[in-house]
Every structure is written in C-alpha cells, then in structure tokens.
C-alpha cells in the first residue's frame, strides 16, 4: 500500500539539512545516511549519498530517474551467494 497523498512524501530531517548545507558549496562530498526510508526529492539530483545496507555505507549517485523512489531501493541488504552445488563424488549412480 502506498503512502497517503495528503501526507506527502517523507525525507529524514537530518538528510534534508545535509543536502541544503552542500547545495551552496562547489565541492560536493558524499553524504552518509542510515535513512533508507527517505524519498528522493528533485533537490537530491547530482549528489552522492552513501546509504547504509546493514554492514557498510554504499555510495549511490542520484539521477533524475530516481526521483520519487526510496533510497533503500537502490542498495540491497541481502547478498545471494548461490545454491549449494552437489558434490559429484558423493552422489550415487544407481542401484
């Protein structure tokens, strides 16, 4: 279920404060955040935001196509390492 229209989009206040502080400066640094639930606003375009995946901060460069999505959508929290491969020596050929 999506968020109610009357509530509007959500973005963490500390993240908005960090974005506003860097808008005036020429050198844009990577902004660290733990807020995966924040919606990407048009003012975020052009910034690199390091989103926490539960283990480390993963840098994400924000483009126009990402506006309206959540930050957590672009950083997976689980890594799939594949299914276990059966050992050929232990399998029986038949009886």
UniProtKB/Swiss-Prot annotation:
Stored PROSITE patterns: RIBOSOMAL_S19
Provide a GO biological process annotation: translation
Keywords, comma-separated and alphabetical: Ribonucleoprotein, Ribosomal protein, RNA-binding, rRNA-binding
A GO molecular function assigned to this protein is: rRNA binding
Q: Which domain of life is it from?
A: Bacteria
Q: Which Pfam families match?
A: Ribosomal_S19
What Gene3D superfamilies would the database entry show? 30s Ribosomal Protein S19, Chain A
Q: Which GO terms describe its cellular component?
A: cytoplasm; small ribosomal subunit
Family stated for the protein in its record: Belongs to the universal ribosomal protein uS19 family.
Question: Function of this protein?
Answer: Protein S19 forms a complex with S13 that binds strongly to the 16S ribosomal RNA.
**What name does UniProt use for this protein?**
Small ribosomal subunit protein uS19
